[in-house]
């Protein structure tokens, strides 16, 4: 079954928004994500500045 192009775009948008909302609710910030596994830790930071 093939979805129309607009339906596919809406599905992707809903999935992305759901992931963002879940991340925001479970983390302190959307700009920092940490993953710990045993003795290793991976951290991803997003740095941003205003253009003004």
Swiss-Prot record:
Membrane topology designation: Single-pass membrane protein
Regions that span the bilayer: 6-26
Pfam family, one: HOK_GEF
Compartmental location: Cell inner membrane
Top-level taxon in the UniProt lineage: Bacteria
The keyword Transmembrane helix belongs to this UniProt entry's keyword annotation: yes
Main localisation: membrane
Any one annotated GO CC term: plasma membrane
Family matches, as InterPro entries: Hok/gef_toxin (IPR000021), Hok/gef_toxin_CS (IPR018084)
Keywords: Cell inner membrane, Cell membrane, Membrane, Plasmid, Toxin-antitoxin system, Transmembrane, Transmembrane helix
Similarity annotation: Belongs to the Hok/Gef family.
Described function: Toxic component of a type I toxin-antitoxin (TA) system. Part of the plasmid-stabilizing activity of plasmid R1; when R1 is lost cells die rapidly. When overexpressed kills cells within 5 minutes; causes collapse of the transmembrane potential and arrest of respiration. Its toxic effect is partially neutralized by antisense RNA Sok.
Name this protein carries in UniProt: Protein Hok
Annotated source species: Escherichia coli
Lineage: Bacteria, Pseudomonadati, Pseudomonadota, Gammaproteobacteria, Enterobacterales
Gene: hok
